[in-house]
Amino acid sequence: MGQLPKPSKISFGTDGLRGRVDTMLTPALALQVGYWCGRVLQAEGPVLIGMDSRSSGSMLVAALTAGLTASGREVWTLGLCPTPAVPGLIRRYSAAGGLMVSASHNPPEDNGIKVFGATGSKLSPERQQAIEAGLCGGDGSGMALAASGAARHRPELLDDYRASLLSSVGQHRLDGVPIVLDLCWGSATACGAEVFSALGADLTVLHGDPDGTRINVNCGSTHLEALRRAVIEKGAAMGFGFDGDADRMLAVDGQGRVVDGDHVLFLWGSVLQEQGQLPDQRLVATVMSNLGFERAWQARGGLLDRTPVGDQHVHAEMVRTGAALGGEQSGHILSSAHGLAGDGVLTALQIASLCHAQQLSLAEWVDQSFQAYPQKLVNVRVENRERRKGWADCAPLSSLVQEAEASMAEDGRVLVRASGTEPLLRVMVEAADQAVVDHWTSSLAAAAELHLNAS
């Protein structure tokens, strides 16, 4: 039997593997990842593979398929689809697991691989480490090829995913509601316009075709300017912008104001609370969520659990506590009633249908929610991974963080963390006063730039 060559050291970040296709995420590496995923996944059944619209996607899917079939696995490729379609279809068809080829909100030249187990959840750290060990371990002697598995292209399975989106809103309709969708040239183009149109919405679509060279470029949830303009120009009730793989969404109300994940959690959570469908009145959010949100939710008698950044941490806490709803300020929203997978299109459908059912505009609903504290996030590029990850060991920077925290006391927060997907140190400051926020973000970002990038 043949053997596969051993790649250099790699590791999973906060959302799988991610990087530039021409340097880090090569076809050779994807073949290896496919092989070791096939070996590490424990359940029987096919392995599903979806992809976003990036130009490198088909190449990487082919390499992953080769690796998986080399491990003896049967593979079903889905083609273009949102990330949440993969875990949903894993559960529906009792698959062994699945992979999504996407770099989410990253630029077009990047790509990534997300891995899901038989329950539809992202792999545990232990399973990820087993794949890493296989990729990088020993002399490759354990990597003998198995008898080849089969591969089939199954795009028709996405009809089940679209049907699940429509059923998620029950009998609610959106007849005549003017809505703008920014599909980001990405995965949301596979279903976003179709499901909103099926519910009767008066739809305007931006960036509505799959385009791997323009995915995330000045559009979608990370660049809301075009969506905000379109909502105002069209006199729309609301707009929704998705990221490249459609697992997250940010909204815009009829006044052009951004409605982030904190507001989505508060609004959807309030409805569940009033319906008696929110155990312990609990929501799960991350350390990035706004203090104004937390205090307003507590004023409603609710509990807010915070986790580290990353929807996998939100997922784990929801499972641990039995929470019904959780998510991130950036727009990943997880609902236990809908499979605990972040799904931007599903979340947009929920918000639109709940607004319509209550006969409220999104702007009116947001005005009834909470006043966010001023919050500012600055990204400092730090190429040195060790310095970036170990920023707290930099005495001048950590001392300045402590000074900022002491000066704001209970009226503000500082959060400094290394990105899990990009060479960035993220500096966030939140306070009751905008001038205080501006002062400390500027000071902390300058200190990080000076001390972490020093030669």
Curated annotation (Swiss-Prot):
GO biological process: carbohydrate metabolic process; peptidoglycan biosynthetic process; UDP-N-acetylglucosamine biosynthetic process
Gene3D superfamilies assigned: Alpha-D-Glucose-1,6-Bisphosphate, subunit A, domain 3 (3.40.120.10), Alpha-D-phosphohexomutase, C-terminal domain (3.30.310.50)
Location of the active site: S104
GO MF, one annotated term: magnesium ion binding
Domain of life: Bacteria
Cofactor binding: number and manner: Binds 1 Mg(2+) ion per subunit.
Protein residues bound to Mg(2+): S104, D243, D245, D247
Top EC class of this enzyme: isomerase
Stated family: Belongs to the phosphohexose mutase family.
Identification of the protein by name: Phosphoglucosamine mutase
Lineage: Bacteria, Bacillati, Cyanobacteriota, Cyanophyceae, Synechococcales
